[in-house]
Amino acid sequence: KAYDSEPLVIAAKASIRTGPWKEQIRFHRALAYNAKTAKDYLLLSDLATRIGARDLGVIKGISALSAGVGAIDETSFPTMNVPFGHESSWTLIHAITRQESQFAEGAISHAGARGLMQLMPGTAREQSGKANLSYNLSSLTGDPQYNIQLGSGYIQRMMDYYGGSYPLAVAAYNAGPGNVNKWLRANGDPRMGGIDW
């Protein structure tokens, strides 16, 4: 195929085999940025499927929406199995995963968060203890189900801690409950009383 012989496509495919996630994501963004037509986006969907790069599918979908090109398909919205007992949080778990890692199993952020649900090692260690699981740093990026199990349990803990408040639980998932509690003390609790516009 002519598309597969393009230098950027060759480089993206090579980075999947050998490169770290931060390198892969640069190529994926460049591919999506260079796509202009619905056909370009469909070729990206096919490439994402063939090389197993769910994050490329998500990035492609975001780019296609921004460009006003109607090339949205299942690669734009990957799905995964959630752990038993967390089925009611399926949408929230997928939203966090889509935002945090674009479904890239090997993602490691600049802050050190790891895997699909972008867990910080300390948070993962704490959550593994609460779930009676052994803590394994390499499994955060090497075992998607391990990462999802810990991340699902952690977001549920934050939901319980903040009385079912999605905004507070998601903020705590991302920035830590200590920071959210500081913000609440400094700015008031939006769950109490009216909001002063």
Language-model-detected regions and their locations in the chain:
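Catalytic glycan-binding domains that act on GlcNAc-containing polysaccharides
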Residues: K1-A2, L8-A11, T18, E23-W197
